[in-house]
């Protein structure tokens, strides 16, 4: 029987399955951070259990770390406790930890792929909803809760039901300057923020194949924002070339044998999906969200929509509520909307290609008066690479703040946050009420679009910036 990529990955990891029971899956990699792990380790301790596979478990600090100092005390008491607990737990249970002083420390979903911990064909979990990022490698990756974190630590397995399958095909060639972020926002604009609920999504088509691994990670990172369980891109030469030579990747003959297997990880001809969505990449413009979910998104050249234009009464009410919170009026061109802050970073867009794209716009320009702009590299290696290329100097000269790695202003769990009423052009993944700080207004954009907003003080079409 012809199978989809998701079905192949799922079936390859079933440990036990019985009638009327949820299948038990083997987990190849478990990524851990300071926020969702303390109670899980406490549970192990209470029952006298070890970590079943410490060598398949990797930890880092990211969510509530300061991006201005490596001082563990800088983000407040709760953050300090969580980070100290992670150090203690990793030492006690023999788990590898990239702490604040480790050169590999960074956002968990940047660190995993960078170190070759993430590989095609794997099952990967983490107590974090954006674990879907790793699906870019043709791995089945999804977020789990703290009780499940404990279960995986104790058993290296997880009960998991089968999801429905959705194919999202993006054909044609994207115009210059159109990034994976624009593509995925356009997809969510079409499906809505709940359009993928109950599905695992496979992204395919010419425009997806043309993306780098970093672009594919951006794409899969936001699969969760359309409600999907996970996102997948079938591995190909782009994937193999990215993985080769990384710290935890197979070496020599082992690598060649792995690639031979990885090449089988694709949807068979004739395999049936439960749903299919198609887009034409040539029609995708730079995207900007205007509301309080990622599906409330338009092209930068458009105007704020009128809630009355929505036929669905639920969508209409949602739009009215969103505009009230966002302080926007229908009919106003997006390019007339001024911003207060800019955030370039997060597990969506903090990799080297993202920083290069932003620096290209920032080069020779200045951050607009009254705007605070942060650039937060996703990991120690990304920061080092950017500095080796001189990107930090471009940003600093333009008036951006060059920070230390961490989740930063993506979520209000550290010192980087919005004040009530402040408007932010952000390269992160969520724009719901209060996500970046109580009363903060978030607009999701690509790194180049964020840099353009920083230097113009409002949303600007990068296609017209010379």
Swiss-Prot record:
<keyword id="KW-0432">Leucine biosynthesis</keyword>
<feature type="binding site">
    <location>
        <position position="410"/>
    </location>
    <ligand>
        <name>[4Fe-4S] cluster</name>
    </ligand>
</feature>
<feature type="binding site">
    <location>
        <position position="407"/>
    </location>
    <ligand>
        <name>[4Fe-4S] cluster</name>
    </ligand>
</feature>
<dbReference type="InterPro" id="IPR018136">
    <property type="entry name" value="Aconitase_4Fe-4S_BS"/>
</dbReference>
<dbReference type="InterPro" id="IPR050067">
    <property type="entry name" value="IPM_dehydratase_rel_enz"/>
</dbReference>
<keyword id="KW-0408">Iron</keyword>
<protein>
    <recommendedName>
        <fullName>3-isopropylmalate dehydratase large subunit</fullName>
        <ecNumber>4.2.1.33</ecNumber>
    </recommendedName>
</protein>
<comment type="function">
    <text>Catalyzes the isomerization between 2-isopropylmalate and 3-isopropylmalate, via the formation of 2-isopropylmaleate.</text>
</comment>
<dbReference type="GO" id="GO:0009098">
    <property type="term" value="P:L-leucine biosynthetic process"/>
</dbReference>
<feature type="binding site">
    <location>
        <position position="347"/>
    </location>
    <ligand>
        <name>[4Fe-4S] cluster</name>
    </ligand>
</feature>
<dbReference type="Pfam" id="PF00330">
    <property type="entry name" value="Aconitase"/>
</dbReference>
<keyword id="KW-0100">Branched-chain amino acid biosynthesis</keyword>
<keyword id="KW-0456">Lyase</keyword>
<dbReference type="GO" id="GO:0051539">
    <property type="term" value="F:4 iron, 4 sulfur cluster binding"/>
</dbReference>
<dbReference type="GO" id="GO:0003861">
    <property type="term" value="F:3-isopropylmalate dehydratase activity"/>
</dbReference>
<keyword id="KW-0479">Metal-binding</keyword>
<dbReference type="InterPro" id="IPR033941">
    <property type="entry name" value="IPMI_cat"/>
</dbReference>
<keyword id="KW-0411">Iron-sulfur</keyword>
<keyword id="KW-0004">4Fe-4S</keyword>
<dbReference type="InterPro" id="IPR015931">
    <property type="entry name" value="Acnase/IPM_dHydase_lsu_aba_1/3"/>
</dbReference>
<comment type="subunit">
    <text>Heterodimer of LeuC and LeuD.</text>
</comment>
<dbReference type="GO" id="GO:0046872">
    <property type="term" value="F:metal ion binding"/>
</dbReference>
<comment type="pathway">
    <text>Amino-acid biosynthesis; L-leucine biosynthesis; L-leucine from 3-methyl-2-oxobutanoate: step 2/4.</text>
</comment>
<keyword id="KW-0028">Amino-acid biosynthesis</keyword>
<dbReference type="InterPro" id="IPR036008">
    <property type="entry name" value="Aconitase_4Fe-4S_dom"/>
</dbReference>
<comment type="similarity">
    <text>Belongs to the aconitase/IPM isomerase family. LeuC type 1 subfamily.</text>
</comment>
<dbReference type="InterPro" id="IPR004430">
    <property type="entry name" value="3-IsopropMal_deHydase_lsu"/>
</dbReference>
<dbReference type="InterPro" id="IPR001030">
    <property type="entry name" value="Acoase/IPM_deHydtase_lsu_aba"/>
</dbReference>
């Amino acid at each position: 029987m012809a199978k989809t990529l998701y079905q192949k990955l799922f079936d390859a990891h079933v440990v036990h399955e019985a009638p009327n029971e949820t299948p038990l899956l083997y987990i190849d990699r478990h990524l851990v951070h300071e926020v969702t792990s303390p109670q899980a380790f406490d549970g192990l301790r209470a029952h006298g259990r070890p970590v079943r596979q410490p060598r398949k478990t990797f930890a880092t600090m990211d969510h509530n770390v300061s991006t201005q100092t490596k001082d563990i005390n800088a983000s407040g008491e709760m953050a300090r406790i969580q980070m100290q607990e992670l150090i203690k737990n990793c030492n006690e249970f023999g788990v590898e930890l990239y702490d604040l002083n480790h050169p590999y420390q960074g956002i968990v979903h940047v660190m995993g792929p960078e170190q070759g911990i993430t590989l095609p064909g794997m099952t990967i979990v983490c107590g974090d909803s954006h674990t879907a990022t790793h699906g870019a490698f043709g791995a089945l990756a999804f977020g789990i809760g703290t009780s499940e974190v404990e279960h995986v630590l104790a058993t290296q397995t997880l009960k998991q039901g089968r999801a429905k399958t959705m194919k999202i095909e993006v054909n044609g060639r994207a115009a210059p300057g159109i990034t994976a972020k624009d593509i995925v926002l356009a997809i969510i604009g079409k499906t809505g923020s709940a359009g993928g609920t109950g599905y695992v999504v496979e992204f395919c088509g010419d425009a997806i194949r043309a993306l780098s691994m970093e672009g594919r990670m951006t794409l899969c990172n936001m699969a969760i924002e359309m409600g999907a369980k996970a996102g997948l891109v079938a591995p190909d030469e782009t994937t193999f070339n990215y993985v080769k030579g990384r710290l935890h990747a197979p070496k020599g003959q082992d690598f060649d044998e792995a690639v031979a297997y990885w090449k089988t990880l694709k949807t068979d001809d004739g395999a049936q999906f439960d749903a299919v969505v198609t887009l034409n990449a040539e029609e995708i413009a730079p995207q900007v969200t205007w509301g309080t979910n990622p599906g409330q998104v338009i092209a930068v050249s458009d105007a704020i929509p009128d809630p009355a234009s929505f036929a669905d009464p639920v969508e209409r009410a949602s739009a009215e509520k969103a505009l009230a919170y966002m302080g926007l009026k229908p009919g106003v061109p997006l390019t007339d909307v001024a911003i207060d802050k800019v955030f370039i970073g997060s597990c969506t867009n903090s990799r080297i290609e993202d920083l290069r794209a932003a620096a290209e716009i920032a080069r020779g320009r200045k951050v607009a008066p009254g705007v605070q702009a942060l650039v937060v590299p996703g990991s120690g290696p990304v920061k080092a690479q950017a500095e080796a290329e001189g990107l930090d100097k471009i940003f600093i000269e333009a008036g951006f703040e060059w920070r230390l790695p961490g989740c930063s202003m993506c979520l209000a769990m550290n010192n980087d946050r919005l004040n009530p009423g402040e408007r932010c052009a952000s390269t992160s993944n969520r724009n719901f009420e209060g996500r970046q700080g109580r009363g903060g207004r978030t607009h999701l954009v690509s790194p180049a679009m964020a840099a353009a907003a920083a230097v113009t003080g409002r949303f600007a079409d990068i296609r017209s910036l010379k």
